[in-house]
Structures are given as C-alpha cells and as structure tokens.
A protein has these predicted regions:
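Short, flexible loop segments at boundaries between secondary-structure elements
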Residues: 197
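WD40 beta-propeller blade-start loop/N-cap
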Residues: 13-16, 68, 137, 191
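A short, structured loop/turn motif at beta-sheet edges
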Residues: 27-29, 80
Length: 223
C-alpha cells in the first residue's frame, strides 16, 4: 500500500529545503537530475547544493551542481530528443502580492539564476542572469511540468503543460525555439482543479495531472 518497503538505501544526502524536494528526472547522459530548494525565502544558502539543480549518477556517486541560484526548482522535464532541461521555479514570497511571478525556464549546465538578489527586476542584481522562457502567476507555487510534441494533436504540439498549485490552474506554454533559446506563450489548458501538482506524460501519450487536495488523477488524451 505504499507505506512500507522491504528495504531502502540512501544514495545521496542533500540539504533540506523549505518545501518538498523538487522533481527528479533521468538525463539523456544517464545521470539523475534533481531540484533542491533553498532553506529560506530570501537568504543566501550555506550549502552549494541548496537552491540548485543537482546531478549525480544513479548509484548516488559524483554529486555535482548543475545550475545554481534557483530558489525552488520544482518540476523538471527534458524536451524530447534534446538535452534542453525545462524547470519550473517558485520565486520569493516576501516582495508583495504581485511580485515576482513564478517562472518556467530552460536551465543549462553552469548557469547562475541570481537567487536571492535577482528575481527578474532587472538592474545590476540581474547582470548575466538568464531570462525565463515564460513568466507565470505570482506566488502560484508552480509545480509539475510535462512536454508534449503532438501527442494531443497538432494544435497542442510543442508545449509545456504546467501546474500551479496555489491557483488551481493547469497552463499550456506554447514553446518556440530560436537557436539555443526558447520563448513561451502562456495559455489556459485545464480548469476546475483544487491544487494540481504532478504532471506526467504517459506511455500512451496522455497527459496525467494529479490533484493534491482531492487525490484524483486526471488523464487528458487526444480524442
């Protein structure tokens, strides 16, 4: 029933963040890639593995920082047939009701995303900080992400399906690639949920979205 395991083994020991651990995915090179949130809303973390996307071998060895300066990297998904990693980012909560917005971004190895000083406001604090693919609602607790490239029909191809826990929204971010960069156009996708969190693509091409509050998993497939 999911409450007991015959055995378990800790393969990598990471710092504790403010919330739950971020997502974990298998990278094209065979490494595991995972998000680790900051231990606070706007402090400078003591550990280099906090507020970061980290990478390690499946047995837990060779722990590395993939990208840093991300307050809470939650959902992770690779764009199919590429090494382009899309990450949902929860931003700071101490700057007002409408600032800053959460982000969806393509994150590349070695990037520094500016937390806690840069949150998209521009100026010297954001010098050399990458730009997000799409800005989402403020304090939305953006969560899971899955990439569709035609499984739901040509009108919904090349899109990131993104869940916002706090707003109850599931959004579609239409992706356009220009060289190594992506731009995103945000559109509604699914309404009526309480607190959507995980978003997955099934082996049959359906988008699966889980509602944290109701315990219901919704399946959205091409008719």
């Amino acid at each position: 029933d999911g409450t007991k395991f015959a055995q378990h083994k800790t393969i990598v020991d990471l710092p504790v963040g403010m919330g739950k651990p971020g997502g974990i995915v298998l990278a094209p090179d065979g490494r595991m890639v995972m998000g680790v949130s900051a231990p606070c809303d706007s402090c400078t973390p003591a550990s280099k593995y906090s507020a970061a996307v980290v990478s390690f071998m499946p047995d837990g060895s060779d722990l590395q920082v993939f990208a840093s300066g991300i307050r809470a990297p939650v959902g992770l998904a690779y764009y199919p047939q590429t090494d382009d990693l899309l990450v949902t980012m929860n931003q700071r909560d101490d700057l007002g009701a409408q600032t800053p917005g959460d982000w969806l971004a393509v994150v590349r190895r070695g990037q520094q995303w500016g937390f806690p000083d840069c949150y998209g406001q521009g100026g010297s604090a954001c010098t050399d900080v990458p730009q997000p693919t799409a800005a989402l609602d403020a304090h939305a607790a953006v969560s899971g992400v899955a990439i569709v490239t035609g499984q739901l029909g040509t009108s919904i191809g090349n899109s990131a399906i993104v869940a916002e826990w706090a707003t109850g929204k599931v959004l579609r971010v239409e992706l356009a690639k220009d060289g190594n960069a992506y731009t995103g156009t945000v559109q509604p996708f699914l309404t009526g949920m309480k607190n959507p969190v995980p978003v997955l693509l099934s082996s049959r091409g359906a988008v699966l979205v889980g509602d944290w509050t109701t315990g219901v998993v919704f399946s959205i497939a091409k008719a």
